[in-house]
Regions:
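Hydrophobic alpha-helical membrane-insertion signals
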Residues: 1-32
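Anion-binding and metal-coordination hotspots
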Residues: 8, 67, 74-87, 98-518
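Glycine-/proline-rich flexible loop or hinge segments
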Residues: 15-19, 44-53, 61-71, 89, ...
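Secondary-structure junction/capping motif
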Residues: 20, 28-29, 59, 266, ...
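Basic, short loop/linker segments at the boundary and entry of helix-turn-helix/winged-helix-like folds
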Residues: 25-68, 444
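Secretory-pathway/luminal and periplasmic proteins that interact with or process carbohydrate-rich
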Residues: 91-96
Length: 518
């Protein structure tokens, strides 16, 4: 049997002509494409974030290329990127073999990219438009809730803060009155009228506590025993503690603003109910409402909002799209979560084709709904004489108007129509549940918008957009969470979370674009 020849190992041998990292990266490698695209971008906005103090920084183009390539491959943490620089030749090729620490990468993201993330996200979009991949003439809008990095037990509730603040103010006012009375009975000076006003804030309590403290020090020694003076000083100390606590409550209310909750460790996050509910008990968790617009499954716009419902995000989100690109898209498609009178009016003012569903869009097309004669949506309406006709043929005349205000401050006008003689009606038990004559509430403006939306949604173009919507933003969210494992934010604060999302959006778009071109 012939002797087996084994090639020698050269691991520990020195080479006179060592290979470069360039030799290990194929010419058509994705990392070369990413690096080429990133280096074609304008670097000035990123350079403007450096102050020129201290040691020379690493190349911003190199760092941007490194971070974007990491996000393309699902590596989002600074430690993960730093580890990849040790073991992955593609990352080594980007940095020329430099071993960057996680702190260097973190400073680049948190101190520099955070200030110009929109510029570079837009730069990627410009490349996609130039290549003809997207046109910015259509946008498919949807939202999802992404959990914050904060713990789920760090909640602060607005109602609880307001209740505790009111109780503490009431308790403090009573204690303050008792202290002032005790000072007066023991020879203290009279309380000025302006200092006798009820306390309504932490500053008021602190001012009153200092006044009482000064007067307590000037009391005649013969008037109070040592124990009584100690008790008085303790009561005054409690006033200062109450002032500090009230200051905390007021700070919490400032952070809350119009929100109902926030997280102590991530004050920008709001507690919301998420679909990922392992205990199935409806538990709320700190999260952000992420809104994105897509075209051909590319991100074209993104924003974060503190409110859990999508209705209030529609207008500011489209305004941001207009600000980002200097124009609105010709059409927008969204689900029924965005269908409101305010949003339809906005689309009309912007002259956009809005393929936006409304509540009951699907339900009102079902046979039981259409054949329900007692449903006010099926009542005959005489537009000329402004009256409805009930199932018994009785006219329902207008009897007043009401105004409702949404959370955004938008005012809607509701007209009331009431039948005149419902007593003894054979259909009364089927037609109404309350006593008296039946009253219906009608928003004519919203109904007109709904009719217009129905015609758009059921048109040939509308059917096309409706069939496209489930495979646009919803598919993107599926890829984002299931394929790229981006399910929870890794930063505290709106600015850093937004920066992280921007980098993810850049990576997502480039990953899809490069995948198409290969």
């Amino acid at each position: 049997m012939a002797k087996i020849q084994i090639k020698s190992e050269t691991r520990h041998e020195l080479s006179f002509f060592p290979n470069s990292f360039d030799d290990y990266v194929p010419k058509d490698s994705k990392v070369r494409m990413v690096d080429r695209i990133v280096r074609s971008m304008d670097i000035n906005p990123l350079m403007d974030t450096y102050d020129g103090i201290g040691a020379p920084p690493y190349s911003p183009k190199m760092l941007l290329s490194l971070v974007v390539f990491a996000y393309i491959n699902g590596v989002y943490s600074c430690h993960g990127i730093a580890d990849a620089l040790k073991y992955d030749v593609r990352y080594m090729w980007i940095c020329g073999g430099k071993q960057l620490s996680f702190a260097t990468i973190n400073r680049f993201r948190s101190n520099h990219m955070i200030k110009c993330i929109d510029f570079y996200f837009d730069a990627v979009i410009s490349i996609l438009v130039e290549k003809g991949v997207i046109s910015l003439e259509e946008q498919y809008v949807d939202g999802t809730k992404i959990e914050s990095k904060a713990n789920k037990y760090t909640f602060v509730w607005k109602k609880t803060v307001e209740k505790n603040r009111a109780k503490l103010l009431e308790k403090t006012s009573a204690a303050l009155a008792q202290i002032k009375e005790q000072i007066r009975l023991n020879g203290g000076s009279d309380i000025k009228e302006e200092d006798s006003e009820p306390v309504t804030s932490a500053k008021d309590v602190e001012r009153s506590a200092r006044l009482c403290e000064r007067q307590a020090k000037n009391l005649p020694k013969a008037k109070l025993t040592g124990r009584e003076k100690q008790k008085l000083n303790t009561q005054i100390d409690h006033l200062f503690k109450a002032s500090d606590k009230l200051c905390e409550y007021e700070k919490s209310l400032d952070i809350l603003g119009e929100r109902n909750s926030y997280s102590k460790t991530d004050p920008d996050a709001t507690f919301m109910r998420l679909k990922e509910d392992a205990m199935n008990n409806g538990q709320t968790k700190p999260a952000y409402n992420l809104q994105i617009a897509t075209e051909n499954q590319y991100w074209t716009n993104f924003a974060l909002y503190p409110n859990p419902t999508d209705t209030l995000t529609f207008k500011p989100f489209l305004d941001k799209y207009k600000k980002r690109y200097g124009k609105q898209s010709k059409s927008v498609t969204a689900d029924s979560g965005y269908g409101s009178e305010e949003n339809y009016e906005y689309l009309e003012m912007e002259e956009m084709m809005g393929y936006v569903k409304y509540n009951w869009f699907h339900k009102e097309q079902h046979k039981p709904f259409k054949e329900d004669a007692f449903n006010q949506a099926n009542f005959y309406y005489n537009r000329d004489d402004d009256y409805y006709v009930c199932p018994m043929g009785q006219h329902m005349e207008p009897c007043g108007q009401r105004q409702t205000k949404s959370d955004s401050g938008y005012v809607s006008v509701i007209t009331l129509y009431r039948a005149q003689r419902c007593d003894g009606c054979p259909l009364g038990s089927l037609c109404k549940k309350s006593k008296g004559n039946r009253t219906i509430y009608v928003n004519h403006k919203l109904n007109a918008y709904k009719k217009e939306a129905f015609l758009l949604l059921t048109s040939e173009e509308g059917l096309k957009h409706r069939s496209q919507r489930p495979i646009e933003p919803e598919a993107v969210f599926g890829q984002m969470k299931a394929d790229m494992h981006y399910k929870r934010f890794r930063h505290f604060g709106m600015d850093k979370v937004y920066m992280d999302l921007g980098l993810f959006g850049m990576g997502f778009n480039l990953k899809k674009y490069l995948g198409i071109k290969r």
